[in-house]
């Protein structure tokens, strides 16, 4: 169903999208800030797609190959804007990506949803909700976009209040890429704050390979706003994506403290990039000292999980057996399937394969230590021998 005046059209959402929006608005996410992770991740993907397409058509850059994500907010207007200069979307793309879920078996899948939120959140795991997570914090969302390589008058504006329909119209947009404007509801207003945004970006997007910047406004002596400027918040290069030969021991040790919140240096570590059936990088550390609750089997353990440099979760215990629960570090996979909130890993062959590889890697490190450094291995055994015996 659609109703059109000139180039403005009102279209109904596919029924499954309505269900998904209902779940977002009555949020199955305990953690509201992840909307930002999802939207920045999408912006990063749009940049990756542009980079890929520009390999065969450099004109798509339109003279600007400096890709990035920019965030700005307006407290008076109650809006947060996330902008990228990636691949952008045409009108057809917008209808396909923001009005429907174009996946086979969708209706059958949604018919299985119950009213049990925890079960639904796991079921929905076969879906990427990405963009729709904006409705966790916003009561209306406006998207302004233009596909790379298209004329400036071929921009598109999409708007929805998360109910049954959305409007779409043609606009003129000077720059390629996508602006997502969130009209924040009451519980989203905490994100209209420079320091809160920096905190979330630092937490989830530090290791995305493109700059994420915030429009920062300083105050003068009278407390009035001075001229603002774009300020890059993330590091924009993940340590584990760098070549091992370029990373100093001190950097590995510092990074260990960052991921483990430990104050001491680790005993040893292993950094590996694997390409083949599964593409992933692992950076695994063996600590020098056991935490005080080591023998508690409910002790939070596991690796940090990233997918394509985007932080997904802490304590992903699926990649280590419990007898190696002292291992710290991360795994960065290019092809893991994740559930909707990315908080529960699907138990599948990829997960099992990575678990097996990481386990072998750790046991190999310990074997090498036992052969080459008695003193270090003795330190390890005193701290973790009892746990290792569980295996």
UniProtKB/Swiss-Prot annotation:
Organism: Aliivibrio fischeri (Vibrio fischeri)
Function: Molecular chaperone. Has ATPase activity.
Localization, UniProt: Cytoplasm
GO MF, one example: ATP binding
Keywords for this protein: ATP-binding, Chaperone, Cytoplasm, Nucleotide-binding, Stress response
Classification via InterPro entries: HATPase_C_sf, Heat_shock_protein_90_CS, Hsp90_fam, Hsp90_N, Ribosomal_Su5_D2-typ_SF
Full protein name: Chaperone protein HtpG
CDD domains: HATPase_Hsp90-like (cd16927)
Coiled-coil segments on the chain, per record: none
Keyword Membrane: no
Domain of life according to the entry: Bacteria
Chaperone keyword on record: yes
Subunit note: Homodimer.
Gene Ontology terms: cellular component: cytoplasm
Protein family according to the UniProt entry: Belongs to the heat shock protein 90 family.
Pfam family, one: HATPase_c_3
């Amino acid at each position: 169903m659609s109703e059109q005046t000139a180039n403005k059209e009102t279209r109904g959402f596919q029924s499954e999208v309505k269900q998904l929006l209902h779940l977002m608005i009555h949020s199955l996410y305990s953690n509201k800030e992840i909307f930002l992770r999802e939207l920045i991740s999408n912006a990063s993907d749009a940049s990756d797609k542009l980079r890929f397409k520009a390999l065969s058509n450099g004109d798509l850059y339109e003279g600007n190959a400096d890709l990035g994500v920019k965030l700005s907010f307006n407290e008076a207007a109650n809006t947060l804007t996330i902008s990228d200069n990636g691949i952008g979307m045409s009108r057809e793309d917008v209808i396909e990506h923001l009005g429907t879920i174009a996946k086979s078996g969708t209706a059958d899948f949604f018919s299985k949803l119950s009213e049990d939120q925890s079960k639904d959140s796991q079921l929905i795991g076969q879906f990427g909700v990405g963009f729709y997570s904006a409705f966790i914090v916003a009561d209306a969302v406006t998207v302004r976009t233009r596909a790379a390589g298209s004329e400036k008058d071929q921009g598109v504006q999409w708007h929805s209040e998360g109910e049954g329909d959305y409007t779409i119209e043609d606009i003129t947009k000077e720059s390629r890429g996508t602006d997502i404007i969130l009209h924040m509801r009451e519980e989203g207003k905490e994100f209209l704050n420079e320091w809160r945004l920096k905190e979330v970006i630092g937490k989830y997007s530090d290791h995305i390979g493109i700059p994420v910047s915030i429009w920062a406004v300083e105050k003068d002596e009278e407390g009035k706003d001075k001229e603002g400027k774009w300020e890059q918040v993330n590091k924009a290069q993940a340590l584990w994506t760098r070549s091992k030969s370029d990373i100093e021991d001190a950097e590995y040790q510092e990074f260990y403290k960052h991921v483990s919140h430990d104050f001491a240096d680790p005993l040893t570590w292993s950094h590996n990039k694997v390409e083949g059936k599964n593409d992933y990088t692992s950076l695994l550390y063996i600590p020098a000292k056991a935490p005080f609750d080591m023998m508690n089997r409910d002790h939070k353990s596991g690796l940090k999980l990233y997918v394509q440099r985007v932080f997904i979760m802490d304590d992903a215990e699926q990649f280590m057996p419990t007898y190696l629960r002292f291992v710290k570090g991360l795994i960065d996979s290019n092809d893991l399937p994740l559930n909707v909130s990315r908080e529960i890993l699907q138990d599948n062959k990829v997960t099992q394969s990575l678990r097996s590889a990481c386990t072998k890697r750790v046991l190999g490190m310990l074997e090498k230590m036992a052969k080459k450094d008695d003193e270090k291995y003795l330190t390890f055994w005193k701290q973790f021998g009892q746990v290792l015996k569980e295996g």
